[in-house]
Amino acid sequence: MKYILILLYVFTSVVTAQPNIIYINADDLGVMDVGFNNSKYHTPNIDRLRNEGMSFTNAYASASNCAPSRACVFSGQYSPRHGVYTVGTSARGQVKDRKLIPIKNTVHLPLEIETLSEVLQAGGYRTIHLGKWHLGMDPTEQGFDVNIGGYNLGGPKGGYYLPIQGQAKVAEFNDDYPVGTHIADVFADQAVRFIRSHREEPFFVHMAYYLIHTPFQAVPEMVDKYGGHRNRWAIYASMVEKMDESIGKILSELDAQGLCDDTLVLFCSDNGAHSDISSQAPHRSGKGSYFEGGIREPLVVRWPGRVAAGATCDVPVMGIDFFPTFIDAAGIAAPKGKILDGLSLLPLLSQSGTIEERSLFWHFPVYLQAYAGKADDSHDPLFRTRPGSALRQGKWKFHEYFEEGRLELYDLEADPGERKNLASLYPQKTTELHQLMQTWRSELQAPIPTELNPKFKSAEN
């Protein structure tokens, strides 16, 4: 806490006005799914943010699927503190394939946990949520003045074009826009209206796109350039471009209102992509996996005059850092007694210093089944991941799986695809990181599944 307070003093002595903050969170967008990392994608507006701001080349989601990643951002805490480990039940996959009884999942972020949006709201910000919430029934219960399209479910199951059926918080705009309007355009229009209405006061815009989550639905005017409607990747790429186009409308409004210099824009994703559709090579696997492809993210921050254009940072960072970063930029102290596991990134953004050296941790004491019939290079044919923990320290990535007590050690510099397990070759480093993991779990009281599942059927049986 002392570290954060010192940063507040130094930074607010230079910047007196609270900046506007726009947090753009893509859904299921992999690190290799943006133009500045992969020229196959057309993302000129995301690329603009990268060219006008700082790109983090070792950025991580705090979890490998939707709800827990978002819970970590808005709580500023690792998963064991809030208990959101997955989406829905923790007992995913066939019961006969699960050796352990998984830890019970907390489906929604508990209301008693003070959120990022609540702290900004109390600090004088006008706040709006647009798009995917997934942390409860109504974002206005957790710090937002306005909610556009956010509720407890993960995506518009019937498609992205109006009229939306059966999902009230999205369908409420069916009568306000022409039939066939894409909901990304609805959200962009609503964000623009909010910015215009509150340009004279600090605002926090949480633009949480449902894109690129399922259902995969081609954008007709964009899909042909990527290979047409029969190509699954082309459909995916057209959705990425549609999101980018929507982002461009928000950036254009900042230009028109003369607000660019007064606005911190952060772009990221909640977890990795569906790797059977969009390869994250050289990283292994994708959404739902704790291999790099499931948790590596594109992260860009633009703040003209405070963040150098075209800058790059290779310090490992993760989603839990957004809470302390945003309140630090706003000159708002962390609430008394509030535990923040992340660090403010302002020293990195301003290139005026660094942050304390640390390890990054993940804890997943539940099961997440593999996508049926799809080879996505994840944990095994049955599960994207099984109960376990992971950490990154420097170049090292360490995994522990609870079913068999298996330990895995990878050198990310030499082996970014996590193919060669070095645990037996480096027993001292493996023991060191295992002990570090155990200490971290003890400090956070992270639950570990130990009860055997009586319905488990091993391969031998």
Task: Describe each region flagged by the PLM.
Residues 3-13:
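Sec-dependent N-terminal signal peptides
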